[in-house]
C-alpha cells in the first residue's frame, strides 16, 4: 500500500497537525475510563508530532450520541487520561467546530495539545458531510489518520475531511495495523491458521468465504460452530443456530474441504440447561447434547483437538471467543485457546474487542505478536475489502 506516514513528512515544525484518533474507550458509571489501550496505542504518533514542534489537534468519537450533544459522551475523560499519559496539559475544546474552537487552535503554540469535543455530536460526521468536514478541518495544515478502528467507516473525520488538507498521511498505529495484516494475509509464513469464534455465522460469513481461499486450516468455535454442526446433521439441542444459514454453512464447509483446507469443529462442549451463570452444566460430546440444553463453551477434547491443530502453525489469526467467556462456567475454552495461541511459535495476530479482552484477562497479551485495535475494520480487511479510511490514504500517498 503506497501510503505516506507521519515520519515521511518534510517538516511538522510550527504546523497545525490534525490527528484522527480513536479514543472510543469503555467508561464506568462514574465516567472513569476502565481500559485505555486505544489511547496508549496512539502515543507514539502524538509524541512524534510534539517532538517535531507541531501544534497537535486531536479528533475522536466516543459512543453513539447520534448527532446530539450528550454529556455522558464527552471527550473529557479521554483528555484527562491523555494528559496523565503525556505528562502535560491537554486542553479540551468546548466543541469540534465553530469560531471558539478556531480561536483556540489559532492561539496554540508548538508542543501544545488540544482535544476536540466528540465529532459524533454532529450528524454530519456519520453522514460523511463535506461541509461538516471542512468546518472540522479548522484550517489545519496536515491531516494524520491514526484511527484504524474506524477506518472501515466512510465518516467525515475519516474520509471527506482529507479533501481539505494539502498533506494527508497515516500515523504509526495505522502503520502497525497494515504491516501485520500484510504479513498475515498477503505474505504469510505457512501453515496459516485462522481461528474464528463468536456467536453468529452471519457476522463472519464474508470473512470465511475469503479465508477459504487463503488459509491452510480453519478452526471454528463459539456459538457460530453450532450452525455448521447442525448443517452437518448433528442434533445440537437448544444451542444457537442460524437456520437460514444452514445451506451456506454446508457449502462453505464443503468448499474448504475441496480446496484442501482443514476445517476443525468442536467434538465436545460445556452444555447448560439455561443461559445463566447459575445454570446446571455438564461436559458432553456433540452427539449427546440433551434436547433442551444448549452448548455455551467448547469442551476439553475440543481444546486438545484445536491446540494440536496449532502445533505446526507459523501464522495464526484469531477473531472471536470460543464460548460465553464473560460467565466463569463457560470461559475455560476461550482461556485455554488464549494459552495455546500465546505459547505457539507462530506469528500471532488477535483482533476484535471480545478476543482482545479475553487475552488481557488471561494476562497473556505480552506473548501475542500483535493485538489489533480494530474489530469491524479488522474483519473487513480479512474479507478483502478496501477500507474507506485507508483508500484515501493511498490516493494521497507518496
UniProtKB/Swiss-Prot annotation:
What Gene Ontology cellular-component terms does the record carry?
cytosol
Q: Quaternary structure per UniProt?
A: Monomer.
Q: What compartments host this protein?
A: Cytoplasm
Naturally occurring in which organism (per UniProt): Geobacter metallireducens (strain ATCC 53774 / DSM 7210 / GS-15)
List the CDD domains hit by this protein, alphabetically.
Phosphoglycerate_kinase
Q: Would the keyword Thylakoid be found if you checked this record's keyword annotation?
A: no
Q: What is its EC number?
A: 2.7.2.3
Family according to the record:
Belongs to the phosphoglycerate kinase family.
Q: Name one GO biological process term.
A: glycolytic process
Q: Which reaction does it catalyse?
A: (2R)-3-phosphoglycerate + ATP = (2R)-3-phospho-glyceroyl phosphate + ADP
Q: What is its main location?
A: cytoplasm
Q: Name one GO molecular function term.
A: ATP binding
**Pathway, according to UniProt?**
Carbohydrate degradation; glycolysis; pyruvate from D-glyceraldehyde 3-phosphate: step 2/5
List of residues binding substrate: 22-24, 38, 61-64, 120, 153
Under what name is this protein listed?
A: Phosphoglycerate kinase
Q: Which Pfam families match?
A: PGK
Provide the binding site for ATP.
204, 326, 352-355
* Alphabetized UniProt keyword annotations: ATP-binding, Cytoplasm, Glycolysis, Kinase, Nucleotide-binding, Transferase
Top-level EC class as recorded in UniProt: transferase
